[in-house]
Amino acid sequence: MAAVGRAGSFGSSSASGAANNASAELRAGGEEDDGQNLWSCILSEVSTRSRSKLPSGKSVLLLGEDGAGKTSLIGKIQGIEEYKKGRGMEYLYLNVHDEDRDDQTRCNVRILDGDLYHKGLLKFAMEANSLKDTLIMLVVDMSRPWTAMDSLQKWASVVREHIDKLKIPPEEMKEMEQKLVRDFQEYVEPGEDFPASPQRRNTSLQEDKDDSVILPLGADTLTCNLGIPVVVVCTKCDAISVLEKEHDYRDEHFDFIQSHIRRFCLQYGAALIYTSVKENKNIDLVYKYIVQKLYGFPFNVPAVVVEKDAVFIPAGWDNDKKIGILHENFQTLKAEDSFEDSIRKPPVRKFVHEKEIVAEDDQVFLMKQQSQLAKQPPTAAGRPVDASPRVPGGSPRTPNRSVTSNVASVTPIPAGSKKIDPNMKAGATSEGVLANFFNSLLSKKTGSPGGPGGVGGSPGGGSAGGTGSNLPPSAKKSGQKPVLTDVQAELDRISRKPEMVSPTSPTSPTEGEAS
């Protein structure tokens, strides 16, 4: 019994040991399984995180005319106040940050020079293996709207020509074109209650898009499919007010311009954004649209067509009917009018800049005048004054006929008589004229018929002598010189002098006879 009991006891101990060994093996196997599961979880998480990580190698290519504001636009998006413009092709970048996964990357930005001479540099910006990761941005200067359509057509043809040179396989190119068409058709206008911060696209949104009804494309939609997204950015929209004031642009002109640009965007499946770096308008909108197209962030900003200087039309929203609404406001323009004939370049106004005249110092000016006066020869202190009295109208006063008849018989002043000194003053000149007049009366010849003898010795009898003469006053001897005007003026002044001094004074005998 005891042996049995020991044996049983032994047997019992051996059985329990076997059970313990089995459980230990199970635990070891379970730990190995847990370890494998842990590593598999870590690997799957890393692989999932790598798949959800923001991709690198995305790029934006800007094309447009010189001075359109391409570098200024990217500098404003970066938040850089001072930036330097390059030549040929500039390289910049945009920081892209995913707030949900705390991940960030850089989006390459290349800006091509506005001169077509540099279009060969596109081979460094658009390669065959990276074309699907590229977004084209066509920049239009709205301060010069008459260049808008030519600029868009020119740079779009440059891109098309370069893509054709890449010789991408037809299957791959067709897949890119179909993706662009699908994105255009699957656009859904966001509601009013959209989130403010961008988030990654989730599967539920994708499933909703798959279940949504896809509408067919219009006749003029995506007729020029490049296979990559295109954005048309109109810069310097703050110049719209300047165009209204200086060039008489009206709302219908801006609607006409917008309608033509939107038709172009329909052909290429492009979005349209009006911006202003000066007024910081829609700058953040451009950045959000870029990261939505390249990195898949949902974009929840609705279209804006009411504000003429802040228009935003995402790709897939527009169609021909919506563009036709703009035509309803046309008064002088028509929808079928040519863009070049309706939006013309205004004539260039030549501004004449007058030279600024700097006033010199008074003392310097006076010294110059003094030196000029010193170089000039000494001139007369006064000039001979015309003694003939004038009426207020400025015409000489006609002397009395009686005085004229007396003067007609007076002989001219001899050549050797005293002349007026030019250096005399005005008063001295008048006295000289009077002296010459009386000297001529004293030196007259007598005895000739019709001559001075009929006048008498005094000027007062001139009237009688004039009336007693048989010859008319106009009858003169051949060779007789005309009577001096100064003598006539002096006689007229002497005859009127009593009236000017005292209106109540009695008339002189000469005036009585003359009257």
UniProtKB/Swiss-Prot annotation:
Keywords: ATP-binding, Centromere, Chromosome, Cytoplasm, Cytoskeleton, Dynein, Endosome, Kinetochore, Membrane, Microtubule, Motor protein, Nucleotide-binding, Phosphoprotein, Transport. GO terms for cellular component: cytoplasmic dynein complex; endocytic vesicle membrane; kinetochore; microtubule; recycling endosome membrane; spindle pole. GO terms for biological process: microtubule cytoskeleton organization; microtubule-based movement; regulation of vesicle-mediated transport. Residues 448-468 have a biased composition (Gly residues). Residues 1-24 have a biased composition (Low complexity). The keyword Kinase does not apply. Residues 397-409, 502-515 have a biased composition (Polar residues). The keyword Nucleotide-binding applies. This is Cytoplasmic dynein 1 light intermediate chain 1. The gene is DYNC1LI1.
